[in-house]
Amino acid sequence: MSISQPERVLIIKLRHHGDVLLSTPVVDALKHKFPDCEVDMLVYAATTDVILDNRQISNIFTIDREWKKQGVRVQLAHEKALFKSLKARNYDWAFNISDQWRAAFLAKLCAHYSAGIACCKRDNFLWRHCHDFLNEELDTSHHMVESNLNVLQPLVLPEEYPAKVRMEISPANRESVLEKLSAQGWNGEPYVLAHPGARWFFKCWEDGKNAALLQLLLLNGKNVVLTASPDAAEQEMVQSILGRLKIPDGVHVWVLSGCLNLRELAAAIDGA
């Protein structure tokens, strides 16, 4: 074990899909400076899709939010199994880029050295005790990627690595999207992809405005692929938008609603 030449590192990011994706430059920065280092990640189970094909990551460990609904005994069994798996990896470093106590405790207990962010809301003895190194919490004038990379300062200075968000897409997921499009009559035509839904509906544009934009694209000869998650509200949104469209001759609208995982959605976006 070496503090300056790590062989095994754990990155903890317990947040949403986008937050996990924006943590991938941390993995890249470590692999850039320490190519032989094994980098693992601990994330919520629901967010694994965005990093599942990332070849820079050796192992992905997960916490399922459903554990707490299964009763205290079952939850404790899951937590114990997770702790045992993490401890067995014998990490040189754990980098906590979350603000949860669970992440702080695991970082402290599962690695020789732990680093985190000096969060304002965690300005207390216990948070400091859980981390051997605490880096400054950057203000909102900095991008989240910069804030994430800032946690690496004991090993990697931010200026040493050009930040790059990475979401790899496997050939199998690319092929799956092509098959699903082909099943709807797509024959390789270029398309514009629209994904009007979101986890939080306050972020969504109005159905009428989405439809007006897509109608304009169709009138200008652009084919459209319309995607949505399996969520019932998003399905309803797609139907509402489709019901407002008048599709001219010679152009197409293909709907991939509720049938794509996140990696397939990324492949569809990449093909647009």
Question: Which residues does each predicted region cover?
Answer:
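Catalytic machinery of carbohydrate-active enzymes
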Residues: 1-272
